[in-house]
Amino acid sequence: MLTFRELKKLAKSEVEGPEYKVAVLGNVATQFFSLGIKGYLKSEGINANVLDTDYNQIDAQLLDTDSETYKLNPDVVILYIATDKIYEEFLDLNVVLRESFAEDYCKKIVNYWNLISNNSNSKIIQTNFTEIDDRAFGNYSAKVKDSFIFQIRKLNYLLEEKMSERKNVFALDLLSIQIRMGLNQFYDNVLYYNAKMAVTMDAVPYIAKNVTDIIKTFRGSFKKGIILDLDNTLWGGVIGDDGLGGIEIGELKRGHVFSDFQRWLKSLKDRGILLCVCSKNNEDTAKEPF
């Protein structure tokens, strides 16, 4: 993983090839986020032109057809709507209105998509929402409809449903990044309140890489196959030495790991990813476990 310092340097580098234009719109500060994306795209040989729009100006950018976003005519528009900011909107609502917060906010985001689609040919990358549990209801938050944790989880679900209906909208899964990194590594209260940044500097490269991976698929660059060894990869042990009865596979001990790995590989196969084998075993020996 590249560091932010490395990404900052890469963002200034020259890359040959046609320009790839990206507009970043957010309800929080996105300067470092945009810089990280530009650096990561250039590290992959993509001549990126990244427009970082002003703080919390999504409506102004999308409603005005003469805005800098539309003038750029971007290949991709990134909508970075941070949980921290909409949490403030949630708290400002009358308690009676909080139960419909997820539905109402989902409609607002879908309207953003419509504006972009009606005024450009841009693809849309939409962030989902990380979780903030204010503990106002404690563990009951998961069953109380007017709690923020209930509404933010519902909003993520509603967004997933809506994105599945739109061919030009793609998810940037911030929640998964938060879970992998851990809340304290992903988010810093001090940074948010002082600089309106919704993620730490350590998190920026991870997010930028995910954006880059999405954009690479737009450009036709993605993994089409996996080449695997057999021994101690698809099963534990060496089939040529241990024999069919001696390799580790199944529900017991290490065998469980290999069984689950095979299940995951099968899910990739079901997606159309080619599974290939490269093994030093004799062909007949290698085929025994199959």
Residue ranges and their predicted role:
Residues M1-E16:
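Short N-terminal or domain-adjacent regulatory/targeting segments
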Residues P18-L35, D231-L234:
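Catalytic nucleophile-elbow at a beta strand-turn-alpha helix junction centered on a G-D-S/GDSL motif
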Residues H256, D260-F290:
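Substrate-recognition element of Asp-dependent hydrolases with the DxDx(T/V) motif
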